[in-house]
Amino acid sequence: VLDLTRHEPRQALAAQAQVRCTDLRLEDWAQPVQSAFESGEGGIEQYLARHRAALSAGRALSHFTLYVEERPVSALTLSLLPGLARLDDIGTVQDCQGQGYATALIQAVLAFARARGARTCVLEASLDGLSIYRKAGFKPLFDYRTFCQE
């Protein structure tokens, strides 16, 4: 969880990077998501269809993509409700990971959400993403584990 009323952005965008809302260009948004989560072609097509349907239904979703020299390298989904923001689908193209692109994208989208009245932001994180989210200022609410019986 992140208190946006006290949040100060920690990282500016690199000069060659741009953040854009890509609701009308979901294919660009999908490239980093697919690369980061290693979903096959069919999986991302189903995911795109669900996101297109949600946008068509007027759901409070926005899709953001960070471009470097016009290449989509990092992406996320923002859900906004009165006073509350949620980040999902945070991913960076594998060959661009570790360069601060996701952190820069998160900071830009947090500023966007705050400007639209969000006071709190939440997200779910895997162990792999914890350092990025902590760097962005998020604090854990709780830990949980998933078990599988084979």
Where are these regions (language model features)?
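Acyl-donor-binding surface of acyltransferase catalytic domains
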Residues: 1-30, 38, 123-125, 147-149
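Ligand-binding pocket scaffold of soluble enzyme catalytic domains
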Residues: 76, 106, 140
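Conserved GNAT acetyl-CoA-binding A-motif
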Residues: 113-125
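A conserved beta-strand-loop-helix scaffold within acyl/acetyltransferase catalytic domains
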Residues: 43-93
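Conserved acetyl-CoA-binding loop-helix of GNAT-fold acetyltransferases
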Residues: 89-94, 98-111, 115, 135
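Helix-loop element at the rim of GNAT/NAT acetyltransferase active sites that forms part
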Residues: 32-44
